[in-house]
Amino acid sequence: MPIPLLSFPLTTQNQRVEGYEVPNEDTPTIYRLTDTSSDTEIDAIIWAAYRQIFSEHLILETYRQPYLESQLRNRAINVRDFIRGLGKSEVYRQEVAQTNSNYRLVDISFKRFLGRATYGKSEQIAWSIVIATQGLHGFIDALVDSEEYRQNFGDDIVPFQRRRFKDRPFNLVNPRYADYWRNRLLEQFLGGQSFYRVVRAGESGKRGVAGAIPSTFLSMAASIAPSGISYQRTADSARTFISTVKLPETTSESKTPPPTVKPATVALPYRYIPGNKTT
């Protein structure tokens, strides 16, 4: 028997109230599958679903799901099942689920499947328990089969960000992974050691910093060092080079006489009037 979803307090969000904004270029485009949808419209629905769930503006060929696309084109599944399949795909597991903590996975999935952010840490904790007990597939099923999803998107509408007002779109402000996964990759490339851990431990000297750098990097750097005298390595060497270098004499005297300016007659205004002295 699954653990029931924990209760959590709600917070104020734009999507919880009706909007009276005038539609403009920021108004989301609604992609809906109907019985009369053409092949071009179905293609637009498929790519809109990829952008929404995978949050990628440029969909790679390896990210595509041909089996799900074929079923949707033949009306074997609806849009809601297509969204469910994308959430359960190996692409979503590798690119989103495995690169984030359960709390951040909940927040990202809510923005992509339900079109809103979570109501706070309490809701993230409640749904992270669902991930821990039912896995990723159970979590995706719970989102797609929820009453909130059905009321806002039904079976034939691609999810979208609901009532975005002045804020940037979710896919522009939320990178695919946070510092949690970036630091983990850093530790893997550094052979299990992290420069940040070395500094926190108090070893801020050269020995502590060198301990976080693989020995292969030092040998590689030494092998590509330029040969010959490098006067830019230290300030003293640079000053010595500048003080000892002999610059050629480039000054010369010009033999051309300077130009002379002769006075010229100027027609002053009103000189044609008799008796008017203009000089």
From Swiss-Prot:
One Pfam family this sequence matches: PBS_linker_poly
Membrane topology, as annotated: Peripheral membrane protein
Chain ranges of the PBS-linker domain: 11-189
Recorded GO CC terms: phycobilisome; plasma membrane-derived thylakoid membrane
Chain segments annotated as transmembrane: none
Recorded superkingdom: Bacteria
Protein's UniProt keywords contain Membrane: yes
InterPro entries: PBS_linker_dom, PBS_linker_sf, Phycobilisome
The keyword Thylakoid is assigned to this record: yes
Keyword terms of this UniProt record: Antenna complex, Membrane, Photosynthesis, Phycobilisome, Thylakoid
GO process terms (BP): photosynthesis
Protein location: Cellular thylakoid membrane
Described function: Rod-core linker protein required for attachment of phycocyanin to allophycocyanin in cores of phycobilisomes. Linker polypeptides determine the state of aggregation and the location of the disk-shaped phycobiliprotein units within the phycobilisome and modulate their spectroscopic properties in order to mediate a directed and optimal energy transfer.
Similarity remark: Belongs to the phycobilisome linker protein family.
Assembly with partners or alone: The phycobilisome is a hemidiscoidal structure that is composed of two distinct substructures: a core complex and a number of rods radiating from the core.
Protein name in UniProt: Phycobilisome rod-core linker polypeptide CpcG1
Species in which this protein is naturally found: Mastigocladus laminosus
